[in-house]
From Swiss-Prot:
Gene that specifies this protein: GAST
Entry's Gene Ontology cellular component terms: extracellular space
Biological process, per Gene Ontology: G protein-coupled receptor signaling pathway; response to food
Cell compartments where the protein resides: Secreted
Identification of the protein by name: Gastrin
Length: 33
């Protein structure tokens, strides 16, 4: 859903979080870089 913009290592982090907020967090998190 987030698309290819999200780095693979961030996607792996999402799997570890396993929370309903994980997707949104990643969407904003990768922009922090």
């Amino acid at each position: 859903q987030l698309g290819p913009q999200v780095p693979a290592h961030l996607r792996t982090d999402l799997s570890k979080k396993q929370g309903p907020w994980a997707e949104e967090e990643a969407a904003y998190g990768w922009m922090d870089f």
